A protein has these predicted regions:
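Charge-dense, helix-prone N-terminal extensions
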Residues: 1-131
């Protein structure tokens, strides 16, 4: 693990405990089981969604991309602004915003799974009542 991961954990320690896990040649940063950032090649990318993405765009920041089958694929993780490395309060603000985006995504997926399960149960009930 590079020195960058412990640096990020220390930078965010006033906000929350942050763990790191290896993934795809980099690391994912997690809080309460949700990945809110990725570190690739000593660069930090934060989770973005429709709520916080405009702040990244306003600063001219770009999403993390990788090549797949000759095409660039963009993830919902955007480059962190440089000032977060000098200002712990900014680091916390951006990390919290990224974690909130991760939480919104997690809740939306959980709701979608619940709706799918309910539809499947309704189909099963309607088939068994015909029989």
């Amino acid at each position: 693990m590079s020195d960058f991961i412990p640096f990020m954990q220390e930078l965010l320690e006033d906000w929350a405990p942050v763990s790191a896990r290896r993934m795809f040649g980099g690391h994912g940063l997690y809080h309460e089981g949700l990945m809110f950032a990725i570190v690739m090649e000593q660069r930090l990318y934060l989770k973005a969604d429709e709520v916080n993405r405009p702040e990244f765009e306003t600063l001219g920041l770009a999403p993390f991309t990788y090549a797949m089958k000759g095409k660039d694929v963009a993830l919902s993780y955007w480059a962190a602004p440089d000032e977060i490395f000098d200002e712990p309060s900014e680091a916390v603000r951006w990390a919290r915003s990224a974690w909130d985006a991760a939480l919104r995504g997690h809740l939306a997926k959980a709701q979608a799974r619940s709706r799918t399960k309910a539809r499947m149960a309704n189909k099963k009930d309607s088939r068994s009542s015909r029989g």
